[in-house]
Amino acid sequence: MPGCDTGANPLGWTQDAGLIGLPQPVLLHWSPKSPFVRKVVIVLDECGLTSQVERRRTVADRLRPDPAYLQRHPLGTIPMLELDDGSILYDSAVICEYLTIIRPTPALLPRAGRARFDVLRRQALADGMLDAILLWRQERIRPPAQQSTAFHAAYALKARTALDALAAEAAQWPEALDLGQIAAGAALAYLDLRFPDLAWRDGRNGLAGWHDRFEARPSAAANRLVLD
């Protein structure tokens, strides 16, 4: 099975027996509550890199950002990956692309051509839907008197439109897992936990069936969202 593109090791990462590996040590700032973090740890698992990464539980509070963390990551979000040379990688899309380059794996991100950009676009759709959902959740937890009816209507429409687009595509998704599918799986799992009233599965049986199969994968089952 084709692997991720290792290229000519242009960044100088270590190679052993023809495989490009992670520099050591590597630190992932994470939380089991973040769907974007979940996307990264599923990719780590699929790439066989989980044991090479130290995890540090990090709180990324939107209203009370940690000044020390902001010095390393100006946006203060998670996930963030710290490499041994002090380099910092964020956000989840950048981290995932890095992981698919440094370690051969079933081709989560094709090397080139239309197939590559199909996967990147699918990831962008899933991540964009998740960004919208997270903003919508912030509106939902405001005091009822301060909530905007127009905001709710707009973001409900965005969520439904994105879900319909994913549902329309799901039947044509390749059998082999790719990065765009991982992003979609992480976003849909978050909807199950935080937005059960959205009932995204209703009328989208194909997408729902795909998601059930995704969640049964060992990499997904080992990295469930935990909303403590």
Which positions does each model-derived feature cover?
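GST-like domain detector, emphasizing the conserved glutathione-binding G-site
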Residues: 2-149
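Non-transmembrane alpha-helical segments in soluble domains
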Residues: 96, 100, 120-123, 163, ...
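Short, flexible helix/strand-to-coil boundary loops that buttress conserved ligand/catalytic motifs
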Residues: 41, 93, 134, 195, ...
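GST-like fold's C-terminal all-alpha helical module
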Residues: 126-212
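Charged phosphate-binding loop/patch that engages nucleotide di/tri-phosphates or the phosphate backbone
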Residues: 209-223
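Short, hydrophobic secondary-structure boundary micro-motifs
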Residues: 106-111, 199-201, 221-226
